[in-house]
Amino acid sequence: GCKKRKARKRPKCKKARKRPKCKRRKVAKKKC
């Protein structure tokens, strides 16, 4: 998921960026 710190530069992050929840909270941009 996009909330986890270990998610940086992982393929899961790329998927997380496309999720509406992540875009709304801007978590994917900061932590991925």
From Swiss-Prot:
Tissue: Testis.
Region (Disordered): 1-32
GO-annotated cellular components: nucleosome; nucleus
Keyword annotations from UniProtKB, A to Z: Chromosome, Developmental protein, Differentiation, DNA condensation, DNA-binding, Nucleosome core, Nucleus, Spermatogenesis
Domain of life from the UniProt record: Eukaryota
UniProt subcellular location: Nucleus; Chromosome
Function per UniProt: Protamines substitute for histones in the chromatin of sperm during the haploid phase of spermatogenesis. They compact sperm DNA into a highly condensed, stable and inactive complex.
Protein name in the entry: Protamine S4
